[in-house]
Structure formats: structure tokens, C-alpha cells
Amino acid sequence: MTVLINEVSKYFSKQTGTVQVLENINFQLEKGDFVTVIGPSGCGKSTLLKIVAGLDNDFEGEIIIDGERITKPSKKQGFIFQEHRLFPWLTVEENIAADLSLKDKYVKDKVKEWVEIVRLDGFEKSYPKEISGGMSQRVAIARALLRDPSVLLLDEPFGALDAFTRSHLQEVLLNIWEQKKTTMIFVTHDIDEAIYLSNRIVIMSAKPGKIHKVIENNLPYPRSKTSESFQEIRKKVLQQFEHGGLIQTSI
């Protein structure tokens, strides 16, 4: 077992009182799982991801990764935000290395490996302002995976990108997953993206956020979004939104 989300609930305090954001979230991921999380805006998807990342420890319940209770960020979790958050004064390879020294041969070799995996060969010495948004997200992916985390957490990482770039980065991410079998939790608003990438789809309901349904996705890779089997799963997901009353809010 890689990740256990056990009885997780979350509350926010406001002037009008206490608001429950998450209610009794229970979920387990095995090593190599690729899970996508979808649901209405405000259902707590990103909040849950931050809790798993150790970025928010004010919650009820527990997060266990590789048998260890998580209370803060560690090398067990890699996190990718919607914005790439690169350091503008560092080059591509320096951003991937982050706080590690490129003078260390092991680090330099690992950076070189990830530059090749995310297809940034020739841009190692470039600065963030000199590369595109899609390339910047590839740098962020490589940086998050450099330390071989137990789980990679992605919070709508392709949401701000154009359709072509998003499609390209989906292929890059799947290639990484197939090579490394890193456990991944990917939050998205895009149903097609959720089906295309993952082997399990977690559908959340809102107010408070809870798991409404988990759909197994056994479509073989590579996948075609126009195939009959893909459309069948899409129909199944949409039915959950309609029958569960989740379609009232934008997804």
C-alpha cells in the first residue's frame, strides 16, 4: 500500500460560523495507481490534495504514506500546482535540481535523465522567461519527480494551457507513469482528461465534500477519446453527475 486517506474531515472557520469542507474521506491507493479526482467547484478537491501533500495539517483523520503518518511535506510527496512556480533567476536544469547542487554528479545525472524524459533537451541553460508555459510545466514535473516521491500530487496542472499543449503534456505524463510507475493523484475539472489518464476516477460531491463514487477505468493504453469504450465510461461518469445532483454546479 502506498497511500491511505483515513476518515479525513476538514472545517473552515468564518465570521458566520464553522463550515465543513470535507466529510469522512476514505480512500486507498496502491503503488502505481493513477487516480483522477473530479467534482463540482468547491467540493474540496484541492483542499484534499494539500492535506495529502502535508501542506495543511489542520484536519481530522490521518494520511499514511508507506506506513508513515504525514503531518508535513516530505520527500514522499511531489506536488505540481496549476502555475509552474519556477524560480525566474534559475535555468531549467537549476530549477529541476532546486535546492540540490548540480556539482554533485549523481544530481547532475538525475537532472539530465529528467530533462530527456520530459523532452527538454537543448533548453537546460534557458531561463523560464525564454520558454513556453507548457515547457515550464514540464520543468515543474521533472522537479517534482527528481527525488522519486512515493506519490505525485497534481492540482489541475494543465488547466491554464491551450488544448494542443494540454494534450501534449498528457502524453508526457503518461509516458512518465508508464516508465516509472509513480503513484499519482490528479485533480481536474475535465471529464475527458480524467478518463484519458487514470485507472480510477474519484467523483466528489460538495457541501461538504465527500466521495460520491469511484469508477474503475480498465481501458487499455494508449486510449482514444473517440472510441466507443471511452464514450461508454464518459456516459457513466456523466450519469453520476446527473443522478447524484452534481451537475447543478460547473465541472
UniProtKB/Swiss-Prot annotation:
It comes from Bacillus thuringiensis (strain Al Hakam). GO terms for cellular component: plasma membrane. The complex is composed of two ATP-binding proteins (SsuB), two transmembrane proteins (SsuC) and a solute-binding protein (SsuA). InterPro entries: AAA+_ATPase (IPR003593), ABC_transporter-like_ATP-bd (IPR003439), ABC_transporter-like_CS (IPR017871), ABC_transporter_ATP-bind (IPR050166), P-loop_NTPase (IPR027417). Its EC number is 7.6.2.14. Pfam families: ABC_tran. It catalyses: ATP + H2O + aliphatic sulfonate-[sulfonate-binding protein]Side 1 = ADP + phosphate + aliphatic sulfonateSide 2 + [sulfonate-binding protein]Side 1. ATP binds at G39, P40, S41, G42, C43, G44, K45, S46. Keywords: ATP-binding, Cell membrane, Membrane, Nucleotide-binding, Translocase, Transport. This is Aliphatic sulfonates import ATP-binding protein SsuB. PROSITE patterns: ABC_TRANSPORTER_1 (PS00211), ABC_TRANSPORTER_2 (PS50893), SSUB (PS51291).
